[in-house]
Amino acid sequence: MFMGEFDHQLDTKGRMIIPSKFRYDLNERFIITRGLDKCLFGYTLEEWQQIEEKMKTLPMTKKDARKFMRMFFSGAVEVELDKQGRINIPQNLRKYANLSKECTVIGVSNRIEIWDRETWNDFYDESEESFEDIAEDLIDFDF
């Protein structure tokens, strides 16, 4: 399970260190792709296989299903950690997520997310205001 928030930098070659807390669970190779809210999603290879199976159930007769699958899968790339714990994020994904030098990597249960730091901070500030209301609307259990 992935959790936590970590600030890292993207170098001029598009490489970024993956937080050490995430490296063990991700293994040496994992998948990154376009996420929602202008971030990148990162999945273990095992989790990616499960997502692929779920996506196969989407009705291809639905235009939105086709659009979503095209965007999600065409952006997917297998990345490999180098000896310094970095991955190379392809230019098309850096552009999609508007990644600048300053990035934030967060853990979200079964995936990691890679955000431009300013975009993350804006999203966080906006979401923090409605956090309790969202919990009340979505969650039916105590914790």
Curated annotation (Swiss-Prot):
Coiled coil: none annotated. GO terms for molecular function: DNA-binding transcription factor activity; transcription cis-regulatory region binding. One of its GO terms (cellular component) is nucleoid. It comes from the Bacteria. Keywords: Cytoplasm, DNA-binding, Repeat, Transcription, Transcription regulation. Belongs to the MraZ family. This is Transcriptional regulator MraZ.
